[in-house]
């Protein structure tokens, strides 16, 4: 009976165990950043979304389409939040999973939000992260079976 329960538990949990690769945008020091403690916060809010703020270490999360469905296109998703927070669930991972189901390789960019405390020039920080994300996806396009000329950005 215990084996049966464990088996069923694993079967039902498998769809939720789709661990994604998370890639740091920069190796070493993040450009245009001040040396401060990482104070990133993530708050789950069932009424709104999962809210991420105070990002100082930007990352790129990879959502691959199912085998045989990939169509060679990619999208980098920049979750919204009015440059105050990132809505990382609804406008990030949920959107990425929907794109992946359509055969599009999706990436969620956790980017730095304008902040005088963490950036030397807050007017260019988010743009630097978006540009770096595009460079990474183009550079590793072959690894993910992406046509480097078919990479879009959303957000």
Residue ranges of each PLM-predicted region?
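Short beta-to-alpha linker loops that shape the active-site pocket of alpha/beta-hydrolase fold enzymes
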Residues: 81, 110-114
